[in-house]
């Protein structure tokens, strides 16, 4: 799952655009953004250590050739939304930027956004993109200097029928509701690259990437909830309007210096900023009454504003000394330093709109919350505003030193051996849950992480690989703060006493390349996880999910098969650089996970959270190229079993 993977961008750690997750959504990275994507499931000393499943490295696109300019436009229709009366909340503009203005105080009604959603008709999914670049030659040595820029905008609509059902630990159903959810997703992405080569020995590159992603939704839910009046079988209505407005800005400076014919220096820095906003979340609950519905009293009418600011600085410097092996000349010795310094600052303001004057709403088909919640009724004491503040900070500092050697002893044998030392310091300070949870905690760990990777070439087309390594998984910021987040179908709360997990990894892989562009691969893997982290349901009157080290250890084992096959490749007539190609890809895996939890009723253990036993991906791609023009059409099928 998300917890055990790591995503890097040009070799630097990349945070998610959504603070809810560890890894960024790969949906942002189309062919106009990426040069290549590498997936590594065997780990070495120079790579990421906070990983247990796979490291996904995205290499950003650079200019190819002397220059180019391209445009793109696309549209689509969702049959569930195109002709529907689509509910859209107030406060988000065409570009997806939300109005984040909070009231100056709680002594008057001065919220900027309306409570009543509007109705929109004829929703069309759409996207636009533009890209271009130019190459220049500088100085008497004609050193190449290139610029590349791409940007895009996407809007799409979704409609979902939802069932929300919650039970207590004893099995009693306390929530059973059916809902309709209307969601609009708006995003923009921009990538700029400047690349400079000096005398074919030194290289400097700068990348700027900005991602803005807004998801806004209106959900209407009817049914049973224990918070509703028991005079009418706990029946009622809930409307939840939520916006998640997130921004990720990435700045990268990368350099490579050829010091001698055998010695080079790689150095660089990356500064990432994440702004995660949930502005003016609106929750309203109406309980069933004799003549219709009434607004529920207590803390059941809320407006909520939260902000998460994350600053993420990454630095690295490494020396590479190339060794003579008189075979493929791939042997080398590497040693260096990497550092990652992350500051998370979270603040949330909750406004409880306590009901004083109860008025009856005859029908849910036509009602207005703005007719009740306004300045006139506030001045008449129909309701009061109570303000609550929550905040926490998490600081994470990781210093790493590594050394590794790669040597090709014979045309068949290649060995990579490495050692990495990580010093991890994490500190969390919190004052949350209306002052009910105050405190701080620290995680301080020293990791010695050995790795060994062997490759044996059976012949020109077959090879065997063996990987043995130790890695770890750190808790996310939200998982070690006891702030309780209120979701539509569950509440979740962090655990400041959570400990990191240690991973011991073993991978054995067979590769068969019938042709240079085709592949058949079979992998068997085993992992031992100490102190595995999982999300669990806490036995309490409130009923919420939290994070725990659920066992002393867990085991993971499985097999994976991958096939890349060219069905046909034909030249295009009357084209010097033409190709008509049809290819297919298949990737499938089976994963067995087991953790034996103390005091569990099932003594045989249970599978880890988020681990799907069966995963299958299939694609059929047609690529037509003629000169500088190309057309790619791909059919993709995915299957993921129940987790």
Please name every model-derived segment.
Residues 113-220, 450-452:
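Transmembrane beta-barrel wall of Gram-negative outer-membrane proteins
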Residues 524-528, 545-642:
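Gram-negative outer-membrane beta-barrel transporters
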Residues 75-79, 151-157, 210-214, 271-277, ...:
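Transmembrane beta-strands of outer-membrane beta-barrel pores
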